[in-house]
Curated annotation (Swiss-Prot):
It comes from the Eukaryota. It is found in: Cytoplasm. It comes from Pinus strobus. This is Pinosylvin synthase 2. Substrate binds at K60, F61, K62, R63, L273, G311, G312, R313.
Length: 396
């Protein structure tokens, strides 16, 4: 097909496409400096929400925290902030959305910027080479969005093409990889900055006897941001890829309506989590694996390196048991959960970072612990599952 002056549109179309798979070229992470110890968090939480007299509920919360397999978490909300903003410590009695959003509008982009600067530094290329920005958060719905704010904070060129991924929840760490792959492979020379930034100020509130799933969330979630540089056809000896993004998919688990959900209200984001979630994920995950890896003639799930969203200890335990996984497969996932809790969309990128670093420290032959192929799973509201097939990079 040709148009005016002999321009070949088909050749032009092909010239816009990259030759190879999208690669993750750099990873950066960031957390607030405030650290809460899980062993003392029940005392801290019930003291700051003025519920110390509710000893029965506090004991339940202690048991939830003890079973969480989490050692510590990072949180923006400090004791000082909570004292200045007591409406955050009520359950559902006092409107607090304005207070929350005033904090989140500043802190979510700020922490995202911190992670992005680390990724850009590792990448080693000028910011002017960034062509696209994907910004993901489940916390702030302002217009213009946090994507706009972080682009300003970083000083990105006004022509950078921005995509906002908002209100997706925990599965979105996979979503942004799917989007970044499509952008990088369909725009030759594109370099995509991916940023996920999450903050529990949107969900923090006082306890309730009638909403124990809310207590589960309060025991699991932490604050964090992760950033990636994604691009196809890395420049030899200049860019140093750590993983290739080979294939992606998204699906909704059958009969899972309402299993994980959140509602943004005047009191912030309320959280609902049904006890059936670990069963729903563990009984459906093999279907996702078969769909993803049958095309590569892989059926032994222990021959993969694993990056699984740490939705909670029960989910990881049941996935491990249902697939007969070697305990080492989820070691990086469990480590990140232990050190940071569930940071929603940012979690899987922390696990990617941990996997490549541990692989090098342990003398493995590839960034995937010595394995060539790997899987990344995101689980979240819907119940939605994101599946990403990754290829590791051999270490020199």
């Amino acid at each position: 097909m040709s148009v005016g002056m002999g321009v070949d549109l088909e050749a032009f179309r092909k010239s816009q496409r990259a030759d190879g798979f999208a690669s993750i070229l750099a990873i950066g992470t960031a957390n607030p400096p405030n650290v809460v110890d899980q062993s003392t968090y029940p005392d801290y939480y019930f003291r700051n929400t003025n519920n110390e007299d509710n000893t029965d509920l506090k004991d339940k919360f202690k048991r939830i925290c003890e079973r969480s397999a989490i050692k510590k978490r990072h949180m923006y909300l400090t004791e000082e902030i909570l004292k200045k903003n007591p409406e955050l410590c009520a359950f559902l009695e006092v409107p607090s959305l304005d207070t929350r959003q005033a904090m989140l509008a500043v802190e979510v982009p700020r922490l995202g910027k911190e992670a992005a600067e680390k990724a850009i530094e590792e990448w080693g290329q000028p910011k002017s080479r960034i062509t696209h920005l994907i910004f993901c958060t489940t916390t702030t719905p302002d217009l213009p969005g946090a994507d706009f704010e972080v682009a300003k904070l970083l000083g990105l060129h006004p022509s950078v093409k921005r995509v906002g991924v908002f209100q997706h929840g925990c599965f979105a760490g996979g979503t942004v990889l799917r989007l970044a792959k499509d952008l990088a492979e369909n725009n030759r020379g594109a370099r995509v900055l991916v940023v996920c930034s999450e903050n529990t100020a949107v969900t923090f509130r006082g306890p309730s006897e009638t909403h124990l799933d809310g207590l589960v969330g309060l025991a699991l979630f932490g604050d964090g941001a992760a950033a990636l540089i994604v691009g196809a056809d890395p420049i030899p000896q200049v860019e140093k890829p750590c993983f290739e993004i080979v294939w992606t998919a998204q699906t909704v688990v059958p009969n899972s309506d309402g299993a994980i959900s959140g509602k943004l209200r005047e009191v912030g984001l309320t959280f609902q989590l049904k006890g059936a979630v670990p069963d729903l994920i563990s009984t459906n995950i093999e279907k996702c694996l078969v769909e993803a890896f049958s095309q590569f003639n892989i059926s032994d799930w222990n021959q993969l390196f694993w990056i699984a969203h740490p939705g909670g200890r029960a989910i990881l335990d049941q996935v491990e048991a249902s697939l007969n996984l070697d305990p080492t497969k989820l070691r990086a996932t469990r480590h990140v959960m232990s050190e940071y809790g569930n940071m929603s969309s940012a979690c899987v990128h922390f696990i990617l970072d941990e996997t490549r670093k541990a692989s090098r420290q342990n003398g493995c032959s590839t960034s995937g612990g010595g394995f060539q192929m790997g899987v990344l799973f995101g689980f979240g509201p819907g119940l939605t599952v994101e599946t990403v097939v990754l290829k590791s990079i051999p270490f020199p």
